[in-house]
């Protein structure tokens, strides 16, 4: 039987921040030639909070830990071309203020030079957080971590044992993913 008081939802914060802030952007056409985007910071915060509540109820988790990416990244030190193709992609309008709100209102984990999914892997496999843990993400790369995962786009758990996680990691390594 699942004990919600001994169960933590490990949230892929980067993905959830991006999804919520993108969903709340609204385009407005002012005239034949002028478009703008606007977003309500309050509505974006409410969307994020509602999403956390929704999944914590489904997953029976009373504890929430949100993993965030560091501003610095060791992969960029190794290869300056890492995610180079994304350099011109803008962040959604309310991404930065939502991130700050999340840091003030939830238990967040951020580690120097690591991305949020790296932090999720550490939290899922270490004793930093006690009890049962469920990763909430959309990122298929989490299948390289021995853990219990709930993919936001699905409706069931994925349980990844250590052998399967190692296999998935090697496949990604060999295919350059």
Spans of model-derived segments:
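Domain-level signal for Mg2+-assisted phosphodiester chemistry and nucleotide/NA-binding surfaces
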Residues: 1-100
């Amino acid at each position: 039987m699942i004990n919600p008081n001994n169960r933590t939802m490990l949230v892929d914060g980067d993905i959830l921040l991006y999804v919520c802030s993108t969903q709340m952007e609204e385009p407005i056409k002012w005239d034949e030639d002028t478009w703008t985007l606007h977003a309500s910071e309050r509505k974006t915060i409410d969307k994020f909070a509602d999403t956390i509540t929704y999944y914590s109820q489904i997953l029976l988790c009373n504890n929430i830990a949100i993993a965030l990416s560091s501003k610095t990244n060791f992969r960029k030190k190794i290869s300056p071309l890492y995610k180079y193709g994304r350099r011109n992609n803008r962040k959604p309008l309310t991404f930065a203020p939502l991130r700050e709100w999340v840091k003030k209102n939830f238990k967040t984990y951020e580690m120097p030079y690591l991305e949020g999914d790296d932090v999720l892997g550490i939290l899922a496999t270490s004793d930093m957080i006690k009890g049962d843990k469920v990763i909430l993400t959309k990122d298929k790369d989490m299948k390289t971590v021995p853990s219990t995962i709930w993919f936001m786009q699905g409706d069931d758990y994925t349980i990844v044992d250590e052998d399967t996680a190692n296999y998935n990691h090697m496949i990604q390594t060999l295919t350059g993913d």
